[in-house]
Amino acid sequence: QIPVLSGYAEHAFDSEYALKDASFTVVDPLQKSSTIKADNALKSVTVFDLLLPTDGTYKISSKVNYPIKYALHNKVWKPFYEVSAQDAGELAKRDYVIADDFPKNQPPSFQEIQREWTLESYVTKNKVSTLNAKNDAPIQVSFSVHPNQIKVNQAVQLNVSKSGKPLKNAQVKF
């Protein structure tokens, strides 16, 4: 078995917040699916033990969402955060707005959305195996090589699609 750690992070491998009420789907090398509910009280990371009884690749996935409040500022919708002006700094240097960015006599128009993430990770025990599991994420990403065989300085082609059709102008960040 191995520990699986996940969380919200601005920088890779530096989790800041645990995933609340996260449920993980695990597809084993034999294509059997199971669900794991992480049960921990940590604030910075969500942790669970993953049993690896069979050699091959395990796909771990989860869907999480988080409500985000947007405010209309100068005809542009921007994320709205409850932060003091002192902590936020200059408006020109940030991509969000706070209450102090609006005139006192003109409350902002708000809109709340649910931001949803589909998280996927792959763990391989001893040897890689074919990934056959159906992907029901709104946006699918497939690799030209097995995800656990990607190496530093190796070119990898990604296919990004939505509803089975190529997604035009997709932006990918690593």
For each feature predicted by the language model, list its residue ranges.
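Beta-strand-rich domain onsets/edges
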Residues: 1-2, 91-156, 161-168
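Short solvent-exposed capping/turn motifs at the termini of beta-strands
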Residues: 8-12, 160-162
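Short, ordered, surface-exposed loop/turn motifs in non-cytosolic proteins
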Residues: 17-20, 164-174
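Short beta-strand segments within Ig-like beta-sandwich modules, predominantly Fibronectin type-III
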Residues: 35-42
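Exposed aromatic-hydrophobic patches
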Residues: 45-52
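Extracellular Ig-like/FN3 beta-sandwich strand-entry sites
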Residues: 55-57
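Short acidic/polar inter-strand loop motif in beta-rich domains
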Residues: 64-75
